[in-house]
Structures are given as C-alpha cells and as structure tokens.
Regions:
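Hydrophobic/aromatic beta-strand patches that form the interior of the parallel beta-sheet core
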Residues: 14, 61-63, 80-82, 130, ...
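A generic, well-ordered mixed alpha/beta core segment in the N-terminal half of proteins
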Residues: 65-110
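Active-site metal-binding motif and surrounding structural segment of the metallo-beta-lactamase
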Residues: 35, 45-83, 197-200
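Metallo-beta-lactamase
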Residues: 35-45, 92-220, 224
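Short acidic-hydrophobic surface loop/beta-edge motif
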Residues: 7-9, 30, 134-139, 204
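Accessory terminal helices/loops
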Residues: 111-113, 196-201, 209-262
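Conserved beta-strand hairpin/beta-sheet module of binuclear metal-dependent hydrolase folds
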Residues: 4-51, 155-168
Length: 262
C-alpha cells in the first residue's frame, strides 16, 4: 500500500495507519464474515481506493465530520455509509464550506504538490446513507456515540470479541489534538467512559496503534493544556513530555482556541 500501513490488530481486523500526505487520518477495517466494514475513509479518493480494494465493502462508518476522515466516501460504491445524525448534517454544511475554501486557496498558491491539487479536484463529497442516534450493532462490532467531545458528535467502534477500540479523533497517540471544534470538558467525560470499556488495543485517529496507557496519556494532555491555558494563557510553555509529539504546532493553536473562548 502507498498511502497506508496496514497492521492487523485482531483476527479479521486491521488498522490502516496513514502514511502519506494523501491519507492524513487513520482508518480501520473489520471482516464481518464475508463482507467488510471500513471505519473512516481518509481525505482523498486516491487513498480511499486502497481501502476499498481490500475486500467487498458492505459498510462504511464516518466517525465525525472532519474531512480527513470522510472525504474518501465517494469511492465506496455499493456500500452503505453510516454516521450519527449530527455528523451527517455537519458533513453537508461544514465540510462543504471547508472544501470550497481549500479549492479557492489552491487557486492562488503555487507551491502545492501537483498530486495534492489533483486529489482535491477529484473530491465529490458523499453524505452518509443512514444515521444512528446512540448505538448500532454490526455483529462483532458495536458503533457507539457518547455525544460530542472532539467535535459536536463523535462515534467510535468497539470490537467486543477482540478487545479493540477504534477511537478516531477522540484519542490520538503521541499527537497534539485539534481542539478547535471541540468541547473539552465533555471530551474528558467521554474519555472516562472509554476507559471503562473492555479493550487492550487502541486504534487512534492519528498516530500509531496503542493501548490503554495511550488513552491515559491523551487524557493527561487535555487536562494539562486546560490547566496551562487557565494559569498562563495563550503563551503557556509546552511541557517537555509533549515536545516530540506529532503536529507540534498544535499546542499553541489549542491554547489560542482555549483562551479565545473566555
């Protein structure tokens, strides 16, 4: 695979870890017994085609509305796409706005790699076909939402028979979060509920496959940055433990968001 690194996390379940600029968000694949479920579709059709080519895909899940997890939807012809009701509405509105802005930006920028320009030109947003409110079962896979934390509506996939949690952007591994569309206190509450689930393997929305300790580390990150914003404001220094995390500009960006809300 060119755009993902495939890692088996259980019998019949794989993490697709983003490995190129055309696939910046992780995805997941679950064999439901002769048909495949794909969890999140990355942000470009060219990357999503790698996922679609791994088996007969019957179901696609959109965990939340951010484009790096849903703009590959269009390539899954014949599959049913599922999201929360709120996520579907946000894909229809917010993603459309952001995609239009990105295309306008590319028209006035000369230093963007041609493969990015071509990928963006190909995107045709596709909305989820079905919605759910709290929980949806796909046999061994339970699709659940506890409401909004990272965004106004976030879903995760729990393989109850294998102890695997596909957390999407509710949990990142050694990566700074994007908090700009989030609800931090609700997010912390969701993380506490996730910690109560039976899992040993964590597939994050960004970063490598991890485990329970990575959920603890990410919860500590949110707690620490909330405290830093409260005590020191937008210029709070980044703690040593987070300086080598991915998306290094995220600390300052998140502080700006948190202090700007006051």
């Amino acid at each position: 695979m060119t755009h993902f690194r495939l890692e088996q996390v259980a019998d019949g379940a794989w993490a697709a870890i983003a490995a190129s600029d055309l696939a910046t968000g992780n995805a997941g694949l679950v064999d439901l017994g002769g048909e495949m479920l794909v969890f999140d579709t990355s942000w470009t059709p060219v990357a999503a085609r790698e996922l679609a080519g791994l088996g007969p895909v019957r179901w696609v899940v959109n965990s939340h509305w951010h484009g790096d997890h849903v703009l590959g939807n269009q390539v899954f012809e014949g599959a049913t796409i599922v999201s929360t009701r709120a996520t579907r509405e946000l894909i229809a509105t917010r993603d459309a706005e952001r995609l239009a802005g990105l295309r306008q930006e590319l028209e006035t920028t000369d230093d963007v790699p041609p493969e990015i320009v071509e990928a963006v030109a190909e995107i045709e947003p596709r909305l989820p076909d079905e919605v759910f409110d709290e929980r949806r079962s796909f046999g061994r896979a339970e699709l659940v939402t506890y409401g909004g934390g990272h965004t106004s509506s976030d879903a995760f996939l729990h393989l109850t028979d294998a102890g695997v949690l596909f957390a999407a952007d509710l949990v990142l591994v050694r990566s700074h979060a994007w908090m700009g569309d989030g609800h931090p206190q609700a997010w912390l509450g969701i993380l506490d509920r996730l910690a109560g689930l039976d899992f040993d393997v964590l597939v994050p929305g960004h970063g490598d496959v991890g485990g329970r300790s990575d959920l603890d580390d990410f919860r500590a990150y949110l707690t620490d940055i909330l405290a830093a914003a409260e005590e020191h404001g937008a210029h709070a220094p980044i703690p040593e433990r987070y300086r080598d995390w991915a998306f290094e500009d995220g600390w300052a960006r998140n502080l700006a968001f948190l202090t700007g809300r006051r």
